[in-house]
């Protein structure tokens, strides 16, 4: 009876020891083309200026972040009203969120 449980347990230990370690996964970072980011900034400023009924020169974009297949630009107006512009992976404008 003891032998019946011993062999499967031993075989399992041998097989576990033979497995190869899984490769280390790293986060993917895509470098954004400067021209694309400038176009995205201009579009974000334009959309924010329309939403807040002001001129583009009174809009400041302060941060540019990449997320899972999308981009976000954070900014604020001269009245310190914050907003976030969202773009898809290709740089197309999705929406503007007021914060």
Swiss-Prot record:
- Signal peptide stretch: 1-17
Q: What keywords does the record list, in alphabetical order?
A: Cell membrane, Lipoprotein, Membrane, Palmitate, Signal
Location(s), subcellular: Cell membrane
GO CC aspect terms: plasma membrane
Q: How does it sit in the membrane?
A: Lipid-anchor
Where are lipid groups covalently attached, annotated S-diacylglycerol cysteine?
Answer: 18
Name the lipidated positions (N-palmitoyl cysteine): 18
Name used for this protein in its record:
Uncharacterized lipoprotein YsaB
| Organism of this sequence | Shigella flexneri
The gene behind this protein is: ysaB
């Amino acid at each position: 009876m003891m032998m019946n449980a011993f062999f499967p347990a031993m075989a399992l230990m041998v097989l576990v020891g033979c497995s190869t370690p899984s490769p280390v996964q790293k986060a993917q970072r895509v470098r954004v083309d400067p021209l694309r980011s400038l176009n995205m900034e201009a579009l974000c400023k334009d959309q924010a200026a329309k939403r807040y009924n002001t001129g583009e020169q009174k809009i400041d974009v302060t941060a540019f972040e990449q997320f899972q297949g999308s981009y976000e630009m954070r900014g604020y107006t001269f009245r310190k009203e914050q907003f976030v512009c969202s773009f898809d992976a290709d740089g197309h404008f999705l929406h503007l969120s007021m914060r």
